[in-house]
A protein has these predicted regions:
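N-terminal amphipathic/basic-hydrophobic helices that include classical n-h-c signal peptides
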Residues: 1-21
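An interfacial alpha-helical scaffold signature
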Residues: 14-15, 19-278
C-alpha cells in the first residue's frame, strides 16, 4: 500500500545547514504510541538499515515515541535527496519503517500514529519538544483512530471477453457495424454494472466504518480502479465488515469486476482530518 503518515510540520524537519553542524547521528521517529502503561519492547523488526534498534522515548504520561539513532552519513539531507531518486532504496526504507509501526499496532491497548518517512530531529529532546508542541493536534488524531484499524478495498473492472467483429465477403457492411455496436453496448453495460456495484460497496462498507477515504490511484497503475478506498473500522465491527466485504466481492464478480480486500493496517489514511468519501 502507499505509505502515508503524520508530519509534525510542513517545512523540512532538519535543514541542510543544521545537519552540517550536527555530529554523527540524529533521531529518527517511526511512530507515536498512546497507552495506559508503557509498552514492552521485545524482539521485533530491526528497523532501517544502519539505524540503532528501535526504542521508546517518553513524551509525557501515557505517550511515547518509537525512535532510533540514524547516521547522518546515510540519513542526512544530501543522502536522503540522493536516495529519493532510487526507488528500490525508498521501497526498502518504507518497508522497514512500516514493519516497526505495524509491530506496535499489535500491542494490546495501544493506539499508534505512524510518522511520515524521514521524520528526523537533531536529538531525542528536540523530537519530544516538537511532539509536545503538537499535543492538541495529536490528541485529535488519537481520538479519531482509537480502537480502529484501517482496511483497504480496491475494485477493478475485468476485461470483457468479446469476439472481435470480422468483416467477411459474405457479411454486409450493416451487419458488421451492428456487431460492433453490440460489442460497444456490452462494454458500456458492464461498465455501468461495475460502477453500481462499486457505489453499493462503498455505501455498505461505509456504514460499518467510522470514516471512509478514497485513495489516490497509483501512478504506475495501467488500469485505474473503479474504487480505491480506505475504511477506518472499529475493532468491534471487524467481523461484520469482513463479512460485508465478502458479500460485496460476490456482487462485484457478478457485475464483471474484482474486489480485493487488504488489511488490517495502521490508520495511515486517517491521520489527517478530511471529508469522508461520498
Amino acid at each position: 500500500m502507499g505509505f502515508d503518515g503524520y508530519a509534525p510540520r510542513s517545512e523540512p524537519l532538519i535543514s541542510s545547514s543544521s545537519l552540517k553542524r550536527m555530529a554523527g547521528t540524529a533521531t529518527y521517529v517511526y511512530c507515536i504510541v498512546q497507552r495506559s502503561a508503557r509498552p514492552r519492547v521485545t524482539r521485533g523488526p530491526s528497523g532501517l538499515g544502519d539505524a540503532s534498534i528501535p526504542r521508546l522515548v517518553d513524551i509525557e504520561k501515557g505517550l511515547w515515541m518509537v525512535c532510533a539513532d540514524v547516521p547522518l552519513a546515510s540519513y542526512g539531507a544530501a543522502s536522503i535527496e540522493r536516495g529519493l531518486r532510487d526507488l528500490d532504496w525508498v521501497s526498502r526504507v518504507a518497508i522497514a519503517h512500516e514493519a516497526v509501526v505495524e509491530r506496535f499496532t499489535k500491542v494490546s491497548g495501544a493506539t499508534v500514529i505512524p510518522m511520515k518517512l524521514f521524520t528526523i530531529f537533531s536529538n531525542d529532546e528536540r523530537a519530544c519538544e516538537e511532539m509536545r508542541s503538537r499535543r492538541r493536534d495529536l490528541g485529535g488524531i488519537f481520538r479519531r483512530i482509537k480502537g480502529c484499524q484501517e482496511w483497504g478495498v480496491r475494485i477493478t473492472r475485468r476485461a470483457l471477453a468479446l469476439p472481435k467483429p470480422q468483416r467477411s465477403a459474405s457479411a454486409s457492411g450493416s451487419a458488421f457495424l451492428a456487431e460492433k455496436k453490440r460489442a460497444r453496448d456490452a462494454v458500456l453495460q458492464q461498465s455501468q454494472q461495475v460502477v453500481r456495484a462499486a457505489d453499493e460497496t462503498l455505501r455498505a462498507l461505509g456504514r460499518l466504518a467510522r470514516e471512509t477515504r478514497r485513495r489516490e490511484p497509483l501512478e504506475a497503475a495501467t488500469t485505474p480502479p473503479v474504487l480505491d478506498a480506505a475504511f477506518l473500522v472499529p475493532l468491534l465491527r471487524r467481523a461484520r465488515f469482513k463479512s460485508a466485504a465478502t458479500r460485496a466481492a460476490s456482487m462485484c464478480v457478478d457485475a464483471g469486476a474484482e474486489l480485493v480486500l487488504t488489511g488490517p493496517w495502521p490508520a495511515y489514511h486517517f491521520i489527517h482530518s478530511g471529508d469522508s468519501a461520498a
